Amino acid sequence: MGCEVSKLCAFCCVSDPEGSNHGVTGLDEDRRGEGNDLPQFREFSIETLRNATSGFATENIVSEHGEKAPNVVYKGKLDNQRRIAVKRFNRKAWPDSRQFLEEAKAVGQLRNYRMANLLGCCYEGEERLLVAEFMPNETLAKHLFHWESQPMKWAMRLRVALHIAQALEYCTGKGRALYHDLNAYRVLFDDDSNPRLSCFGLMKNSRDGKSYSTNLAFTPPEYLRTGRVTPESVMYSYGTLLLDLLSGKHIPPSHALDLIRDRNIQMLIDSCLEGQFSSDDGTELIRLASRCLQYEPRERPNPKSLVTAMIPLQKDLETPSHQLMGIPSSASTTPLSPLGEACLRTDLTAIHEILEKLSYKDDEGAATELSFQMWTNQMQDSLNFKKKGDVAFRHKEFANAIDCYSQFIEGGTMVSPTVYARRSLCYLMNEMPQEALNDAMQAQVISPAWHIASYLQAVALSALGQENEAHAALKDGSMLESKRNRL
């Protein structure tokens, strides 16, 4: 093992009430990260969020259990290309819209780079939604329990523990010490693979709902007695998170404590960590987890002492998180495909050639049409308009193609992302970038994971002078194309 088991076994569960008063933290030097570049909390319309998530498309669901979950989280993109995560609550979760808004506003005042911050909310009719920063690199649960390419390294696990402790200290200092159901699914990884704490846990899943949705084996003992979550309950949950990091498994605290008391440490530590840490470091992390899991809430540490304890344990401080995780950095330059290169250069002629060669191959499974019984002369006329549009598109008669494609779309008998993409390019050829952007966004509504829709948005945004947004859209297109090619 990476730590000497004989020395670790000499450790038994020790309470350290004095430790909760340790003072030095790493947060003071981190004030630069209080989210000053983020927009202020705002209220969104349901229409805006519906458009951002392509009509709450199932392809955009990023939460555990998919559509079966009582509260579903979607990824989305606003008109300004900012990527967002949208949590849509069960319709009966928050009947009092005023109470929901007050809670959301309070959480929305928090801004810290250790968190996936809350950007806004929506409370139209029975709809209750939260809007947060989108974190593209999955959850801690994914990287710990369901890893594919490599297990998480010891140095990265320590970094996760520190960052989450710092996030909890920040929230506590801002008067939001209660965090509901802290677990590995609440820890997210940003563009640079740095771990962040989801803001969603700062609000209950409903006005009167439970604070813990996980198995009762992981629930703080006082919550089982009283049904109330306290700041000390959050520390208990942090202890279960440390167990996850130590073991690489979601191990019940009672079982972990039994292993520690029996000095059977080898059964607790993830075998993937062999050779990565010292006996002293392993002992210290187990000691810290045991303190967090004390039965008596008053014997648990507070967030400040967690930060103090975690700072000396940090390893490979100069190594970026994305390197430790084996994930490409957001700043790294991924080679663009020929289409991506053409969009980067705004080479409309090259884009036209690629779309012409592609034809309607990407419409498979995305385009919809009426049933056989609904075939009518009207539909045949509509299809004829599409064919005429295709001929005009092939011969670079772009104004004519716009007219034909528009009549096809207005016919309403079939929905085709490729038609919208082709008309978008025609608008660009005719120096109508706003119309081109609208069509590219509509193509993405129909086919949320289609890279060409993002690429065309990038070209249109560049033509509109929105270079930052264009860069973000180009990056999204490249990521979607890479993901598609891996399938």
From Swiss-Prot:
Binding-site list for ATP: H65, G66, E67, K68, A69, P70, N71, V72, V73, K87
EC number: 2.7.11.1
Official protein name in the record: Serine/threonine-protein kinase BSK7
Annotated gene: BSK7
Keyword tRNA-binding: no
Keyword list, A-Z: ATP-binding, Brassinosteroid signaling pathway, Cell membrane, Kinase, Lipoprotein, Membrane, Myristate, Nucleotide-binding, Serine/threonine-protein kinase, Transferase
Organism of provenance: Arabidopsis thaliana (Mouse-ear cress)
GO cellular component: nucleus; plasma membrane; plasmodesma
Membrane topology: Lipid-anchor
Limits of the Protein kinase domain: 59-325
Enzyme class name: transferase
UniProt key word Transmembrane: no
Catalyzed reactions per annotation: L-seryl-[protein] + ATP = O-phospho-L-seryl-[protein] + ADP + H(+); L-threonyl-[protein] + ATP = O-phospho-L-threonyl-[protein] + ADP + H(+)
Location(s) in or outside the cell: Cell membrane
UniProt xrefs under PANTHER family: SERINE/THREONINE-PROTEIN KINASE BSK5, SERINE_THREONINE-PROTEIN KINASE BSK7-RELATED
